Amino acid sequence: MEKLSFKEIQQNKTFDLGIVTLTEEDIINYAKLNDPLDFHIDRKAAELSFFKGFVASGSQIFNSLYKTGWIPMFGHTVICGLELNHWKFMRPVYAAQPISGTATPISIKENEEKKHAVVIWGYEFKDAKGMLVQTLEVTVLHKI
């Protein structure tokens, strides 16, 4: 992913974050650090769970594609994050399931005097069939 300038952030312009396919090992390692529930870290517990197998922690898909897709494009423009809202987990994400992500600025409020802008980013993550698995909004203060 190439670095993009703040000027390229336009309301309703969608940016592709790429695709992530998590392995069972990815799910277990992430969960051990961030969400150590049995059905994320123990094979037998995962198979006996509601999900009948390993599923990613709710935050893992966002964190993965944010790190590999969004930060390389826009990280250099960030002053700080301000809010995270409306995080919805619609479908479980299993190991070996490819998930694609996009980020779309849904609101941009520039302050020329202070040389910053508040941007509300809408994130969508979909499975290979195009079904939403997760959505959220993140409000970020950007340098302009």
Regions found by a protein language model. Give the residues of each.
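Generic beta-strand hydrophobic packing signal
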Residues: 85-87
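Hot-dog-fold acyl-thioester-processing enzymes
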Residues: 1-83
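HotDog/MaoC-like acyl-thioester-processing domains
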Residues: 1-11, 89-144
